[in-house]
Amino acid sequence: RLSHSDVLIVHNDKMEIWLKEQGYTKPMVCLEIFDYLSPSVNNNTHEPNQKPIKVIYAGALNYRKNKYLYSLNDVMSKWQFELYGKRFEEDKIKDKTLFKFKGFVPSDQLIEQVSAHFGLIWEGDSIHTCSGDLGIYQKINNPHKASLYIRCNLPIIIWKEAALASFVAE
């Protein structure tokens, strides 16, 4: 079906390469990162040495999609995770004090109220690498949550092999 288009707007150069490897031959334009339009402003700040380190994750929270979330308390016991989204399966968490489940919050409200050190972009089965189908997709995908975190004035934690990793590093 893509071959019916004149031009594709793709997320990034890695997605462009992947599509070419799949046989797509028409022109492509790389978006690089999504805009995030919002009248909301986040003026909250955190000192680098302030404890605990607070990390937000916004998105689908169910075990099937983000199995790694349910293993974080094995390695991140001194951090606190604020989870925004739906379908968090709290019964699968060992140490419930590590997580603050905020539920679904409209994006403008989240931008104004979030108070954290980092935003996390990660998906898949493992806390060590983005694995599984959803994790591997990070190699060519630009998650919209990256733009949300930037709009919240948050530095981003991202897998080193993710398509947006070089953008985040810059």
Q: Language-model features: where?
A:
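Nucleotide-sugar-dependent
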Residues: 110-151, 157-166
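Nucleotide-sugar donor phosphate/pyrophosphate-binding loop at the beta->alpha transition
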Residues: 1, 37, 138
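Short active-site oxyanion
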Residues: 3-8, 80-81, 152-156
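A short acidic/histidine/glycine-rich donor-binding loop in glycosyltransferase catalytic cores
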Residues: 170
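Conserved catalytic-core segment of nucleotide-activated headgroup transferases in glycan assembly
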Residues: 36-112
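Carbohydrate-associated surface elements
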Residues: 14, 33-34
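A short, active-site helix/loop in glycosyltransferases that binds the activated sugar's phosphate group
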Residues: 4-28, 88, 162, 166-167
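Short, well-ordered alpha-helix to beta-strand connector turns
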Residues: 4-6, 96, 116-117
